[in-house]
Curated annotation (Swiss-Prot):
Cited function: Regulatory subunit of a potassium efflux system that confers protection against electrophiles. Required for full activity of KefC. Shows redox enzymatic activity, but this enzymatic activity is not required for activation of KefC.
Gene coding for it: kefF
Family: Belongs to the NAD(P)H dehydrogenase (quinone) family. KefF subfamily.
EC number in record: 1.6.5.2
Catalytic activity: a quinone + NADH + H(+) = a quinol + NAD(+); a quinone + NADPH + H(+) = a quinol + NADP(+)
Location of the protein in the cell: Cell inner membrane
Protein name in the entry: Glutathione-regulated potassium-efflux system ancillary protein KefF
Length: 176
């Protein structure tokens, strides 16, 4: 099962993430948990989230990039749900062997995130990748949709289909 942990602070303003979710919903075996809808007060149901994670083979963290990082509720979710004794530490093997995909949208162009004056995705993903590895998750190459503020509908739709294809290819490779 693919579990998408969706963290968009302003989902009603979303153009790119909305299309990505629409495409993902067309696949079988996909569950979407919209954190800002489930937890507007930031009071996370840890047991429910851990139960959802236990059913997943692929975990996707999908969100818009904010100040070169993840939205605050996703950070809190990781802090609370990936608990000692469950996700890491003595007896913390619940996530071992599962896969993690970072699916992020950005307002800037792809060249904006190449090494130079701004850090590239290899640098930006390091804290997330380190978290994944520490918890026994298999880190997958990130999926990024760039220029989301200036893309036309056709481009956004094409990128969303590419996202769906990426998820489908993972399903086919791991579940035949």
């Amino acid at each position: 099962m693919i579990l998408i942990i969706y963290a968009h602070p302003y989902p009603h303003h979303s153009h790119a993430n909305k299309r990505m979710l629409e495409q993902a919903r067309t696949l079988e075996g996909v569950e979407i948990r919209s954190l800002y809808q489930l937890y507007p007060d930031f009071n996370i149901d840890i047991a429910a989230e851990q139960e959802a994670l236990s059913r997943a083979d692929l975990i996707v963290w999908q969100h818009p990039m904010q100040w070169y990082s993840i939205p605050p509720l996703l950070k809190l979710w990781i802090d609370k749900v990936f608990s000692h004794g469950w996700a890491y530490g003595h007896g913390g093997t619940a996530l071992h062997g599962k896969h993690l995909l970072w699916a992020v949208t950005t307002g800037g162009g792809e060249s904006h995130f190449e090494i130079g004056t701004h850090p590239g995705f290899d640098v930006l993903s390091q804290p997330l990748q380190a978290t994944a590895i520490y918890c026994g998750l298999n880190w997958l190459p990130p999926f990024a949709m760039h220029c989301t503020f200036i893309c036309d509908d056709e481009t956004l739709e094409g990128q969303a289909r590419h996202y769906k294809q990426r998820l489908l290819e993972w399903q086919e490779a791991h579940h035949g």
